[in-house]
UniProtKB/Swiss-Prot annotation:
UniProt cross-references to PROSITE patterns, sorted A to Z: FN3, IG_LIKE
Disulfide bond keyword on record: yes
Basic and acidic residues composition-biased segments: 713-725, 1176-1187
Domain (Ig-like C2-type): residue spans on this chain: 35-125, 139-226, 240-328, 333-420, 425-507, 518-607
Swiss-Prot/TrEMBL keywords: Cell adhesion, Cell membrane, Cell projection, Developmental protein, Differentiation, Disease variant, Disulfide bond, Glycoprotein, Hereditary spastic paraplegia, Hirschsprung disease, Immunoglobulin domain, Intellectual disability, Membrane, Neurodegeneration, Neurogenesis, Phosphoprotein, Repeat, Signal, Transmembrane, Transmembrane helix
Outcome following mutation: N369K: Found in L1 syndrome; likely pathogenic
Organism per entry: Homo sapiens
Name of the molecule in the record: Neural cell adhesion molecule L1
Major localization class: membrane
Length: 1257
């Protein structure tokens, strides 16, 4: 058995004795038990007629207990009494008296006591007082009418019959309606009804006192009292007088722990009010209540500190009356130390302590087996000393039951306690060989519950038989438990408990295992987070590997768990994530790491911050100040949500003029909760207040009541007054209208005045509602003095300021006179002109419009492409720099003055920009010629910016960091290719090409590459095959710059039916990009083999479509050899003629390149799209936008069936094309791609849709 010591706590006893009873585990010994009273009736019983009376007395004990009763100290035998029934139960002496009339119940009145005895002693019950009460009756009496004059006091008596049980008194009328009670009319604790002063409305003849007796469940009533009030015309005021109590002071005794009720009822006119005072100290506010309109003071649970004087003070306008209560706090007897029953072994000393307290001090008496000690023989060996009964050297014959009884005038206490002397062998009640587990640093408790008589001594030994108490960490308890504090790993082992008395000794073994303590290695950290965000707490802990670990989370002491219907909490792997933080989430969060042996906790605090809460309350005060357009606003502070409130924003809304729009009246510091506001006349103000902290504004407060300020004349005039004409013969006067909150009345209008400037004549005026006025029939551009004044039903606004306005403008007639144009550089000029005559402007000179456009290049036949640019120059400036111009271009320039009406006539001028450096060449490509040579192809720049004089080509190996750079000046501007030789096949190069004018080289285009990447192992790229019913197309993507080569394609049918038949291998050129094989069989699988230089390079599979073999038509003459030879001869002849034609064309018909360029479309109007392959980049920018805008038609055309055609017609050109047997080039290759280059090397071909000329502009 393993015992975890997590919840084992020791039982501490103050003396070496056992528990009150023999433990149930102590088996095999038949031990007797002294009698013990287990149940008895209350100390006081009140019975009523026809009630049954039950007197209970039950007790336990071995041997069986015998019962006897006494009544008023005389032996009482219930079995012999008529009408008494005794319970037939082994442990009960209870009996019941069956009542049928009041006399029968009264015959059994008295003080009863029960005695329970066996051979070990006698136990005694407390005194049971039985009281009989008859049916309540109101004594016969004659009630005379009560006559009193209006304003006097009166007391209506009740005087109910006496009762042993508390009564409830009610005053009602004959209609069973309660008499209304207030400060003037009050019922006292004694049941009387007190009138401080009577009114004529109190005149009734049916004041009835009802008494409710809860014991008998009956209500009886007094004869009605007739109260007759005599009316009077002059009620006399009088000072208060106490009706109860009637004297000036009283002395009361209050019982400790019971409630205290004090009462003062006064009369007088006007009706007095009651106050309560305590001169000796403050009232205990937490225990005092005031009832019955302050006439009754009730003090709950009276204590000794409540002793002293209490005063009631009755006051009205004529004086006061008072009464002093002097309260003495006393107490019924109560236990300080109650005697306890114990078992003792022979020779021990027995001591029973009976310590009581009370006020007055209780008298203590002792009994032994129910007999007072004074009546016992004097040779008894007990002694009574300081409230204790002591017996020395007890023996089994000294077994007894004692009674300690304490009484004073407020009550009685009784306690039974036995001294049981017995001899029992020692026995350890704790199981043997238990295993206990605890963690290092904690305290372990090894149990050894022993029992015997005399009480066995308990000793703990280690495995060596040595007492463990030599180590100060080991400590014993009186109940035999061994405690070991500050456990260490080497405390693991076996321990032995030895219990012994004078009869025997016994031993058990306990096993202790000490485990590693749980430790939190990384606990959660306190943090401050914003509302609505999420927070993550982490927790890591180390555990003993043999224990079951657990990490849980707690928030403010409550366990946290993930909720199935909410994602508020996420708990996993020592992490607690709280989503959507709210202010209710702030608090202390704990990581609890636990095993079955220990628990450790690490705590962190979470503060949730955010904008403030709403202002809870808003109050307007000083409303009389509204006549002065002021009001005071007060509010309760808002919740700051852990961030100090920086300010309060006071806003208002006018539901009449601008509903649902709020305006700020100002802000006050955050520590201020009221302010006086300056208001505007005639505004319907509804206020609200918003708190603001560093996280922003909170929710606004509830809105206030609406207040309206009185009307007044306007305090402001419109602003931004202007006079401008929208026609040449008028002037439009405009202004910014007043805000509605500045109207100071329900409506506002504007008084507009005007007159020509410089005249002293009368003002013309007009009152309008709109924020403008049109003055007609004016001269062109004449200045006027203008005033605009606000007016309403209460008067005019302040005297307005005079504003100068002008009538309508006309178009300017002034022409700017150019002073000259200064060429700053090839792309910028400075334009200057003289100021215009303002009289000719016909209005306000707003500035100058400078318009310019490029008419074309200075080169011949350059096409005009007009794109106008505009620059607006301020009126006080007469020059402008035009930048961003195209070099070597002709420009047209216009300058116009303009006013508010428009622009005047223009002055014109033309100028030209000088030459500049050209742009970068277009489309630089590298083509492999051999392992050591490359062919560079390019296009001229789109922007010549002058006359091209040639190109500068430079290159260097990349691996040498720019060393060994070579440069070539290519003087021919028409050059488009250049062949580089003697290159290393193992290096990559950086090539840079620049076009030049007389101003020098321009931007460069850069390309990197080498022969190594272009002339290596043949690469078919992305090769694929598709099939139809009787054909298949093989396609591939030629690698850019790859040297051309020829290879074989072989189709081989698969399957037994096909017999593995192969078609003749076909010779194909790499630059073809595709090959179509015809004459295939439908629904057939084929293998495709690619060979180069008799070496296998690639293989793929394809399957044709269809469902059967294709039937070939009968062979005709087209398949005969003679026909094939004839056709071949014709084709060869045509090819020779075509070659001769190209040679002749290349040698003759040449013309100026410049003339040719000038015949082409302007490069800006129709730029050419580069159709060559490869990439390039500028030295200035790798991502410069290209100027190509149009596309060329495809040069490939439809795919031509190749079959076994080896014709070179597709590779014709101005140079010879020869192949080795393997299909590789012998000479320079200039295939279809060469045809696409416009104006190639030594080419003079005409412009055509597939050979467009390159635009040089």
């Amino acid at each position: 058995m393993v015992v975890a010591l997590r919840y084992v706590w020791p039982l501490l006893l103050c003396s070496p004795c056992l528990l009150i009873q023999i433990p149930e585990e102590y088996e095999g010994h038949h031990v007797m038990e002294p009698p013990v009273i287990t149940e008895q009736s209350p100390r006081r019983l009140v019975v009523f007629p026809t009630d049954d009376i039950s007197l209970k007395c039950e007790a336990s004990g071995k041997p069986e207990v015998q019962f006897r009763w006494t009544r008023d100290g005389v032996h009482f035998k219930p079995k012999e009494e008529l009408g008494v029934t005794v319970y037939q139960s082994p442990h009960s002496g209870s009996f019941t008296i069956t009542g049928n009339n009041s006399n029968f119940a009264q015959r059994f009145q008295g003080i009863y006591r029960c005695f329970a005895s066996n051979k070990l002693g006698t136990a005694m019950s407390h005194e049971i007082r039985l009281m009989a009460e008859g049916a309540p009756k109101w004594p016969k009496e004659t009630v005379k009418p009560v006559e009193v004059e209006e304003g006097e006091s009166v007391v209506l008596p009740c005087n109910p019959p006496p009762s042993a049980e508390p009564l409830r008194i009610y005053w009602m009328n004959s209609k069973i309606l309660h008499i209304k009670q207030d400060e003037r009319v009050t019922m006292g604790q004694n049941g009387n009804l007190y009138f401080a002063n009577v009114l004529t409305s109190d005149n009734h003849s049916d004041y009835i006192c009802h008494a409710h007796f809860p014991g008998t469940r009956t209500i009886i009533q007094k004869e009605p009292i007739d109260l007759r009030v005599k009316a009077t015309n002059s009620m006399i005021d009088r000072k208060p007088r106490l009706l109860f109590p009637t004297n000036s002071s009283s002395h009361l005794v209050a019982l400790q722990g019971q409630p205290l009720v004090l009462e003062c009822i006064a009369e007088g006119f006007p009706t007095p009010t009651i106050k309560w005072l305590r001169p000796s100290g403050p009232m205990p506010a937490d225990r005092v209540t005031y009832q019955n309109h302050n006439k009754t003071l009730q003090l709950l649970k009276v204590g000794e500190e409540d002793d002293g004087e209490y005063r009631c003070l009755a006051e009205n306008s004529l004086g006061s009356a008072r009464h002093a209560y002097y309260v003495t706090v006393e107490a019924a007897p109560y236990w300080l130390h109650k005697p306890q029953s114990h078992l003792y072994g022979p020779g021990e000393t027995a001591r029973l302590d009976c310590q009581v307290q009370g006020r007055p001090q209780p008298e203590v008496t002792w009994r032994i087996n129910g007999i007072p000690v004074e009546e016992l023989a004097k040779d008894q060996k007990y002694r009574i000393q300081r409230g204790a009964l002591i017996l020395s050297n007890v023996q089994p014959s000294d077994t007894m039951v004692t009674q300690c009884e304490a009484r004073n005038r407020h009550g009685l206490l009784l306690a039974n306690a036995y001294i049981y002397v017995v001899q029992l062998p020692a026995k350890i009640l704790t199981a043997d060989n238990q295993t206990y587990m605890a963690v290092q640093g904690s305290t372990a408790y090894l149990l050894c519950k022993a029992f015997g008589a005399p009480v066995p001594s308990v000793q703990w030994l280690d495995e060596d038989g040595t007492t463990v108490l030599q180590d100060e960490r080991f400590f014993p308890y009186a109940n035999g438990t061994l405690g070991i504090r500050d456990l260490q790993a080497n405390d693991t082992g076996r321990y032995f408990c030895l219990a012994a008395n004078d009869q025997n000794n016994v031993t058990i073994m306990a096993n202790l295992k000490v485990k590693d303590a749980t430790q939190i290695t990384q606990g959660p950290r306190s943090t401050i987070e914003k509302k609505g965000s999420r927070v993550t707490f982490t927790c890591q802990a180390s555990f003993d590997p043999s224990l079951q670990p657990s990490i849980t989370w707690r928030g403010d002491g409550r366990d946290l768990q993930e909720l199935g219907d909410s994602d508020k909490y996420f708990i996993e792997d020592g992490r607690l994530v709280i989503h959507s933080l709210d202010y209710s989430d702030q608090g202390n969060y704990s990581c609890v790491a636990s095993t079955e042996l220990d628990v450790v906790e690490s705590r962190a605090q979470l503060l949730v911050v955010g904008s403030p809460g709403p202002v809870p309350r808003l109050v307007l005060s000083d409303l009389h100040l509204l006549t002065q357009s002021q009001v005071r606003v007060s509010w309760s502070p808002a919740e700051d949500h852990n961030a100090p409130i920086e300010k309060y924003d006071i806003e208002f809304e006018d539901k009449e003029m601008a509903p649902e729009k709020w305006y700020s009246l100002g802000k006050v510091p955050g520590n201020q909760t009221s302010t006086t506001l300056k208001l505007s006349p005639y505004v319907h103000y509804t206020f609200r207040v918003t708190a603001i902290n560093k996280y922003g504004p909170g929710e606004p407060s509830p809105v206030s009541e609406t207040v309206v300020t009185p009307e007044a004349a306007p305090e402001k005039n419109p602003v931004d007054v202007k006079g401008e004409g929208n026609e040449t013969t008028n002037m439009v006067i405009t202004w910014k209208p007043l805000r509605w909150m500045d109207w100071n009345a329900p409506q506002v209008q504007y008084r507009v005045q005007w007159r020509p400037q410089g005249t002293r004549g009368p003002w013309q005026e007009q009152i309008v509602s709109d924020p403008f006025l049109v003055v007609s029939n004016t001269s062109t551009f004449v200045p006027y003095e203008i005033k605009v004044q606000a007016v309403n039903s209460q008067g005019k606004g302040p005297e307005p300021q005079v504003t100068i306005g002008y009538s309508g403008e006309d178009y300017p007639q002034a022409i700017p006179e150019l002073e000259g144009i200064e060429i700053l550089n090839s792309s910028a000029v400075l334009v200057k002109w003289r100021p215009v005559d303002l009289a000719q402007v016909k209005g306000h000179l707003r500035g100058y419009n400078v318009t310019y456009w490029r008419e074309g290049s200075q080169r011949k036949h350059s096409k005009r492409h007009i794109h106008k640019d505009h620059v607006v120059v301020p009126a006080n400036t007469t020059s402008v720099i035009l930048s961003g111009l195209r070099p070597y271009s002709s420009y047209h320039l216009e300058v116009q003055a303009f006013n508010g009406r428009g622009s005047g006539p223009a002055s014109e001028f033309t100028f030209s920009t000088p030459e500049g450096v050209p742009g970068h060449p277009e489309a630089l490509h590298l083509e492999c010629q051999s392992n050591t040579s490359l062919l560079l192809r390019w296009q001229p720049p789109l922007s010549h910016n002058g006359v091209l004089t040639g190109y500068v080509l430079s290159y260097h190996p990349l691996d040498e960091g720019g060393k060994g750079q070579l440069s070539f000046n290519l003087r021919d501007p028409e050059l488009r290719t250049h062949n580089l030789t003697d290159l290393s096949p193992h290096l990559r190069y950086r090539f840079q090409l620049q076009a030049t004018t007389k101003e020098g080289p321009g931007e460069a285009i850069v390309r990197e590459g080498g022969t190594m990447a272009l002339s290596g192992i043949s690469d078919f790229g992305n090769i694929s095959a598709t099939a139809g019913e009787n054909y298949s197309v093989v396609s591939w993507v030629p690698k850019e710059g790859q040297c051309n080569f020829r290879f074989h394609i072989l189709f081989k049918a698969l399957g037994e039916e096909k017999g593995g038949a192969s078609l003749s291998p076909q010779y194909v050129s790499y630059n073809q990009s595709s090959y179509t094989q015809w004459d295939l069989q439908p629904d057939t699988d084929y293998e495709i083999h690619l060979f180069k230089e008799r070496m296998f390079r690639h293989q793929m599979a394809v399957k044709t479509n269809g469902t059967g073999r294709v039937r070939l038509p009968p062979a005709g003459f087209a398949t005969e050899g003679w026909f094939i030879g004839f056709v071949s001869a014709i084709i060869l002849l045509l090819l020779v003629l075509l070659i001769l034609c190209f040679i002749k064309r290349s040698k003759g018909g040449k013309y100026s390149v410049k003339d040719k360029e000038d015949t082409q479309v302007d490069s800006e109007a129709r730029p050419m799209k580069d159709e060559t392959f490869g990439e390039y980049r500028s030295l200035e920018s790798d991502n410069e936008e290209k100027a190509f805008g149009s596309s060329q038609p495809s040069l490939n055309g439809d795919i031509k069936p190749l079959g076994s055609d080896d014709s070179l017609a597709d590779y014709g050109g101005s140079v010879d094309v020869q192949f080795n047997e393997d299909g590789s080039f012998i000479g320079q290759y200039s295939g279809k791609k060469e045809k696409e280059a416009a104006g190639g090397n030594d080419s003079s071909g005409a412009t055509s849709p597939i050979n467009p000329a390159v635009a040089l502009e």
